[in-house]
Amino acid sequence: MLPLLLPLPVTPPPPLPSPTLTLAPASAPRRRLVLLAAAAPHHHHHHRRRRVYRRQRAAPTQTRAPRRTLSASNAARGEEDLEEAIYEFMRRSDKPGAFPTRAELVAAGRADLAAAVDACGGWLSLGWSSGGAEAGRASSSVGVHPDYPPEAGAAAAAGGASDLAQGAVWASSREAEASPSGRQPETEEEETETKFGTGLDGMLTRLQRERERVRPPLPRSSDGAGGERDNVALMGQSGAPSHSATGGRYTPKVPDNGNIHSYHPQNGALEHNKSSKSLTNDAWRTWSLDKGGFSDFQAAEIHSTNSRKSFRHDGLDILAQDDVHGPSNGVAVHDYDINDVDSERDDIHARLQNLELDLTAALHTLRSRFDKVISDMSEGDGAKAPNGLSDDWEFEETKVMQAQEELRSIRAKIAVLEGKMALEIIEKNKIIEEKQRRLDEAEKALSELRTVYIVWSNPASEVLLTGSFDGWTSQRRMERSERGTFSLNLRLYPGRYEIKFIVDGVWRNDPLRPLVSNNGHENNLLTVT
């Protein structure tokens, strides 16, 4: 029938009594096939049992959730894709360090991610209980692991991405195998969530506990004490410290040997190498205290005097030998003389240099211990331990390198402080020089003064002296002696002066002195040589 319908656009035929056949548009061939298949049973009876199914398509605005398969690799790939999408959402959100809640995903227009997490379940939905709002607020307030400072920021978020990937594999393996206790996985997840908390904090804590669970014990050396010290140095004082769960709250454990002098969670001190003679306990204590709260110091806050102080922070009593002697507000009281500034500055430089040498020696010791532990484990059957030890070693090495960076920063601050002190000293020296010049001039002027002894020998009851030595502005009383004469001492510069006596209120001249006339006035002449 197609050849008969092709000429229709050129010459339309007259209307016929028979029904006209209309072809379906070319853009919808599926509908045409459906119509032909539906019309087939009228002519062919043997196609009655054949049914045509149409695939139902989902709405284009909704993303299909990843389907679970029996293959562990496919499930892992699906969860990895979902984790990448969630991580991208976290990176672009206002809280990159907090795992998003269901309400946050729906509010941001990502209901598809919320549905995908609900469908995936397991590790990704641990923080999504019925109290989603409370969990969301808890995860938002915590944000990152409590053992890391809040200023870690983007670094914590970036580091959390790798932990998310590890957690996804761990969660998929837990879902694939049955529970060892015979209970449902949901029940175990609820108990774990109640025990360790929800949100990103609980996830990171569970990952750390799982890593410690699968880590075999370290081989002990010949002497038990030495092996225990090495284990404590590499494991107990690592960057991710062990925790003790007490009612959902985790408190960092302090070793019994008391080698941690700083109360900052991230700034724990390394154990000293007992065989190394170059390490100084005083220097390490100073560095720990500076890391703990005295990083922003001034030059007057560093002293060579030793005192013992007890610090209390978060329930931890830490007794350290303090090199900073001063009140509790952080401002040191200095009692040194100004002449000892140079010696104190040299002492500060020497101590900073010793600290830098100690940090370098500690880093070398840490690396040598790690190499020794790795070599011992390679001989034994501990195949999985090097991975965990590598993380601890890298964290300890990072802490030492950060301490070196902070030490360099302190030295830079001291250099700036020395520059300011030099400028202040220069300014003070200029002021001192100016004052000294004025003092010299005054001393020179005083050295030119001469003492003049003036006497009135005539009888009188009261005699006053006035003259041009002060511009005739004052009248000085002369002292009467036992003989009845009046005298007065004056300090005058060399020169010629005019003087006159006031005897009992009458202006008079001394007949024994020379006279001079000035504008019709006669005065006595006084010459100072």
Swiss-Prot record:
Lineage, highest ranks first: Eukaryota, Viridiplantae, Streptophyta, Embryophyta, Tracheophyta
Q: Where is the composition biased (Basic residues)?
A: 41-57
Q: What is known of its domains?
A: Contains a C-terminal (448-529) carbohydrate-binding domain (CBM).
Instruction: Name where it's found.
Output: Plastid, Chloroplast
Q: Which organism is it from?
A: Oryza sativa subsp. japonica (Rice)
Coiled-coil stretches are: 400-452
Molecular function GO terms recorded: amylopectin binding; starch binding
Cite the record's Pro residues compositional bias ranges: 9-18
The tissues in which it is expressed are:
Expressed in leaves, stems and panicles. Expressed at lower levels in roots and developing seeds.
Gene Ontology cellular component terms for the protein in this record = chloroplast
Q: Where is the signal peptide?
A: none
What are the UniProt keywords, alphabetically? Answer: Chloroplast, Coiled coil, Plastid, Transit peptide
Protein task: Involved in compound starch granule formation and starch synthesis in endosperm. May act as a regulatory scaffolding protein and affect starch synthesis and compound starch granule formation through direct interaction with isoamylase 1 (ISA1). Binds starch, amylopectin and amylose through its C-terminal carbohydrate-binding domain (CBM) in vitro.
What name does UniProt use for this protein? Protein FLOURY ENDOSPERM 6, chloroplastic
- Annotated TM spans: none
Ranges for region Disordered: 1-22, 39-77, 166-275
Q: Matching Pfam families, A to Z?
A: AMPK1_CBM
The source's domain of life comes to Eukaryota
The UniProt entry's GO biological process terms, in alphabetical order, are: regulation of endosperm development; starch biosynthetic process
According to the record's subunit comment, the protein's assembly and interactions are: Interacts with SKIPA. Interacts with ISA1.
Consequences of knocking out this gene: Slight reduction in plant height. Reduced size of the endosperm, reduced starch content of the endosperm and floury (opaque) endosperm.
Gene name of this polypeptide: FLO6
Q: Where is the transit peptide?
A: 1-71
The record's InterPro entries line, in alphabetical order, gives: AMPK1_CBM (IPR032640), Ig-like_fold (IPR013783), Ig_E-set (IPR014756)
